[in-house]
């Protein structure tokens, strides 16, 4: 297979031949860390089901159907999943349409909406170099470190740097970075300094339960439970090029925005606020999830009217 600028030849073309759009601007705007966070906020979704909690990124749209890239382990069990978008609206996922990519921890799920949501720009992940600054966006699950036990969720946006790459990818995971992450952020996007998705987060080092038990005087059960919530070491992402190369094998043909230009230096460093932004906060997740049923009921009523009064 031939490669052009690090992208496999099958991916370089038009929406007619490959259903993938390659955008190669000559100049990439330098953004501040806060501007990258604004982009991350709009493209990051929460994915939740009765037995699972994770994140994802909106990568494409076709009519009223949106496509979300996430880690497969977030949606590995057949269940009733919902997506929560940046405006805190929930939508049901049709699990029968979930696409798993072969040999890696990636999946594409879809939801339907009349609303306009921002679509992520992707970037040739061969541009990722050791030492480059990256950001991770995602929704930590209830009970994660720093989350309110009463049902409040806060989207996390953390900065760090690429520290290296695994010689032998594990489930597709290859990119290593220093960003702090928490359970529930799996499937969330890793962004470069231009706000483009360069990878999908999904694996991280965790605290050793025996060391935690000895240090804190905890019971073995408590130590094991808490250890899973603490990620003191490096974290790992599947590079976006892995998705681009494998998508056709899973029947995933989407109009994607893929750029091939290097990331610029950050215009201004990201500094987290003392308090969470209200746009990144869900006070009552159950109330938000109930909005999915209202959306379905509204769509059903519209379809009944159309069948009765065709126009």
Sequence positions of predicted segments:
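Protease-domain processing segments flanking chymotrypsin-fold serine proteases, especially trypsin-like
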Residues: 3-55, 59-60, 292
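Flexible, gly/ser-rich surface segments that form the specificity/activation loops bordering the active-site cleft
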Residues: 32, 118-173, 181-185, 201-214
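C-terminal cap/linker of serine protease catalytic domains
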Residues: 32-37, 141-142, 201-302, 306
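Short Gly/Pro-enriched turn/cap motifs at secondary-structure boundaries
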Residues: 35, 47-48, 97-99, 152, ...
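Conserved active-site neighborhood of the chymotrypsin/trypsin-like protease fold
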Residues: 42-46, 51-53, 63-147, 171-174, ...
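Conserved hydrophobic positions within beta-strands
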Residues: 56-58, 95-97, 162
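Catalytic nucleophile loop of clan PA
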Residues: 57-58, 180-204
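Short, solvent-exposed mixed-charge patches
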Residues: 309-311
């Amino acid at each position: 297979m031939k490669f052009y600028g690090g992208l496999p030849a099958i991916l370089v073309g038009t929406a007619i031949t490959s259903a993938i759009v390659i955008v190669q601007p000559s100049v990439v705007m330098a953004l501040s860390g806060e501007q990258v966070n604004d982009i991350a906020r709009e493209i990051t979704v929460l994915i939740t089901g009765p037995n699972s909690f994770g994140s994802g990124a909106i990568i494409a749209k076709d009519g009223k159907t949106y496509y979300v890239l996430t880690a497969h382990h977030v949606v590995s069990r057949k269940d009733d999943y919902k997506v929560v978008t940046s405006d805190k609206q929930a939508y049901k996922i049709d699990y029968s349409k979930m696409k798993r990519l072969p040999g890696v921890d990636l999946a594409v799920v879809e939801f339907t909406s009349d609303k306009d949501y921002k679509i992520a720009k992707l970037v040739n992940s061969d541009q990722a170099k050791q030492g480059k600054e990256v950001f991770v966006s995602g929704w930590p699950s209830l009970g994660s470190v720093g989350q309110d036990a009463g049902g409040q969720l806060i989207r996390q946006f953390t900065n760090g740097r690429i520290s290296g790459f695994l010689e032998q990818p594990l489930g597709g995971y290859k990119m290593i970075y220093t960003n702090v992450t928490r359970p529930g952020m799996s499937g969330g996007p890793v962004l470069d300094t231009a706000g483009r998705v360069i990878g999908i987060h999904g694996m991280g080092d965790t605290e050793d339960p025996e060391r935690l038990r000895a240090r804190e005087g905890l019971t073995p059960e408590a130590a094991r439970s808490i250890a899973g919530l603490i990620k003191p070491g490096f974290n790992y992402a599947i590079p976006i090029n892995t998705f681009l190369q494998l998508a056709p094998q899973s029947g995933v043909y989407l109009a994607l925005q893929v750029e091939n230009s290097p990331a610029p230096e950050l215009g201004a460093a990201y500094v987290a606020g003392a308090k969470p932004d209200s746009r990144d906060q869900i006070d009552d997740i159950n109330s938000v999830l109930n909005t999915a049923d209202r959306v379905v009921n509204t769509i059903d009523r519209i379809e009944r009217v159309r069948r009765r009064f065709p126009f």
